[in-house]
């Protein structure tokens, strides 16, 4: 019983101690909430310098125009030592920060401390406030507000256009596949390592909680690396090159093992993903919201109109081709006809010799059917397919001064067209040779 009483007394004492510790908090919150925070107004082009913790606010004084599509407004806080900068929406949030809050107190210790901070302000934000907390008393800092053209926004917009209109071609490109895989491997190597470890761990292992925390730690480290990229490149460039080389090779080997996409459905999914990313980049790169929506809609309609325009153009060409009168073919001259006949006849004779010399040709069967086997054999060996007597008869009948020409010139029915190929006896193989 005494032990229970002592245990109970111990519990009562701990509860009383906790009550005594928490009792001052409401009074502190009340005192802090009744005190209005001192706020310093920020103006474009004006630089202010202080050496103690202050609150600053910027209030929008003009409406954004169409010329501000790639305009940025940023607040730069530069200090001699490490400081902590917190961004809030208005003075009310600053007033809430002045109150005592265990969560805010804990999160303030987790906030990153920098000596050069950039805060980007939305063009449509009516008011933006920051709180600069000085850690060391001998710290001096300056706060400047600037507005101007941001080339990075323009670059993002062009990248969005490229991804949206050329997503199909990029999804089928091997160069894009390997370059994207290597880049993702370099940027997200820690995330990939955590993912691979999670596959090796059992699902009910206590390390799952550690891995879940590892994702957030990895993202935090990546943000920290990007913020200090210039210092890392100048001081630790040897380690950076080694890291990029090893991770790049591993990423390339991984991509080479699985190879580019070949399935049409996978390619379509990648194409749609690239197009959605392109539309998202186009939207976030334009600061004027209604102009951003208009550009996204125009790009989408232009991409979809591409196919109907092609169909209309093909239909127009077919209709035009049907309505157009066929142009009469150009007739050959006598010299062109003679040359074409010689070329085609020589080509046909060579094909016939090749066929007769092939193993598929039934030689004995053909010899049994022709009248002059020796003439056929001479023809296959390369001799002419016409005898001198046949050439002489052809020249006598169809040459200059021949009977055919006299009938054409002096015949009574010379105005009637006679369908006769005058060069045919010269080029065709006589039937008598087979």
Curated annotation (Swiss-Prot):
Which keywords fit this entry according to its UniProt record? Developmental protein, Erythrocyte maturation, Membrane, Nucleus, Signal, Transmembrane, Transmembrane helix
Membrane topology listed for this record = Multi-pass membrane protein
Q: How is it modified after translation?
A: Phosphorylated.
Could you give one GO CC term from the UniProt record? nuclear inner membrane
Q: Which family does it belong to?
A: Belongs to the NEMP family.
Record text about domains: The transmembrane domains are required and sufficient for its oligomerization.
Task: Specify the protein name.
Answer: Nuclear envelope integral membrane protein 1a
Species of origin reads: Xenopus laevis
Gene name linked to the record: nemp1a
């Amino acid at each position: 019983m005494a032990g229970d009483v002592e245990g109970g007394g111990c519990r009562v004492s701990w509860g009383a101690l906790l009550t005594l510790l928490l009792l001052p908090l409401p009074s502190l919150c009340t005192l802090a909430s009744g005190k209005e925070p001192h706020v310093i107004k920020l103006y474009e082009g004006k630089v202010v310098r202080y050496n103690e913790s202050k609150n600053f606010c910027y209030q929008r004084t003009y409406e954004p125009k169409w010329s501000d599509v790639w305009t940025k407004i940023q607040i730069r806080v530069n200090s001699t030592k490490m400081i902590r900068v917190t961004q809030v929406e208005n003075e009310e949030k600053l007033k809430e920060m002045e109150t005592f809050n265990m969560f805010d107190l804990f999160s303030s210790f987790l906030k990153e401390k920098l000596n050069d901070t950039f805060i980007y302000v939305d063009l449509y934000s009516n008011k933006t406030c920051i709180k600069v907390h000085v850690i060391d008393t001998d710290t001096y800092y300056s706060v400047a507000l600037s507005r101007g053209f941001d080339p990075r926004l323009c670059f993002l917009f062009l990248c969005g256009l490229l991804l949206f209109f050329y997503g199909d071609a990029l999804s089928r490109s091997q160069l894009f596949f390997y370059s994207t895989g290597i880049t993702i491997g370099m940027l997200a190597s820690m995330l990939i390592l955590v993912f691979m470890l999670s596959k090796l761990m059992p699902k009910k292992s206590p390390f799952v909680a550690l891995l879940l925390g590892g994702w957030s730690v990895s993202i935090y480290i990546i943000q920290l690396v990007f913020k200090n990229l210039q210092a890392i490149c100048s001081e630790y460039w040897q380690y950076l090159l080694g890291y990029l080389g090893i991770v790049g090779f591993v990423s390339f080997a991984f991509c080479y093992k699985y190879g580019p996409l070949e399935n049409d459905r996978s390619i379509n999914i990648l194409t749609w993903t690239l197009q959605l990313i392109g539309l998202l980049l186009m939207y976030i790169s334009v600061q004027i919201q209604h102009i951003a929506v208009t550009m996204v809609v125009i790009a989408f309609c232009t991409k979809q109109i591409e196919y109907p325009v092609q169909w209309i153009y093909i239909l127009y060409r077919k209709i035009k081709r049907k309505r157009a009168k066929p142009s009469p073919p150009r007739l050959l001259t006598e010299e062109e006809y003679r040359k074409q006949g010689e070329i085609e006849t020589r080509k046909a004779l060579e094909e016939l010799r090749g066929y007769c010399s092939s193993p598929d040709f039934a030689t004995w069967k053909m010899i049994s059917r022709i009248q002059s086997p020796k003439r056929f054999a001479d023809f296959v060996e390369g001799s002419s397919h016409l005898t001198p007597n046949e050439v002489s008869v052809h020249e006598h009948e169809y040459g200059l001064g021949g009977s055919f020409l006299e009938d054409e010139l002096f015949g009574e029915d010379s105005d009637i067209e006679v369908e006769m190929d005058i060069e045919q006896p010269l080029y065709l193989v006589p039937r008598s040779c087979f």
